[in-house]
Amino acid sequence: MNKDQLPIENNSRHPRVLVFGGLNMGLITKVTRMPEEGETIRGNEFYASSGGKGATQAVAASRNNSEVKMIGKVGDDIFGKSLLDTLNNENIDTDHIGVDSIASTGTGVIIVDSSSQNRVIATYGANLKCDYEQLQSVNQSVEWANILMLQMEIPFELSVQAA
């Protein structure tokens, strides 16, 4: 086997990637400089961007011709709907993403200055509500997958159990 080839044990030509992890909406403001403590400054640009470590991994895998299933949890809000739409548009299976009726979708408030230094406030919201139901989805899908991707934006004990 060539060192650049992945061992793929399914009949597909594409790896099957199972991602169990964070789904967050990034709220990004670009500024000339970081504000001082207690100071309000004017932002130069603002935008929202789908993200979270898990969602970002899923999109990257899908764009590299992998079949991808995403497992996690979002809130029943506009950010959750937007994240699901983004993942579906990237051909990612979202059937196992739970929707929490109480917790909000995870967010990252990101301030980026003109030298690309940033500060981030992460509110994990529904990501921290991942539970046994999502873990069961991982266990049921793991035989399908060649690769299981995990990270730390969901409860740590669930990542450990999934591994």
Residue ranges and their predicted role:
Residues 2-73, 78-82, 88-92:
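Glycine-rich phosphate/adenosyl-contacting loop at the front of the ribokinase-like
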Residues 101-103:
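Short, glycine-/polar-rich solvent-exposed loops and beta-turns at beta-strand/coil boundaries
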Residues 105-108:
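Short alpha-helix plus adjacent loop in nuclease-associated cores
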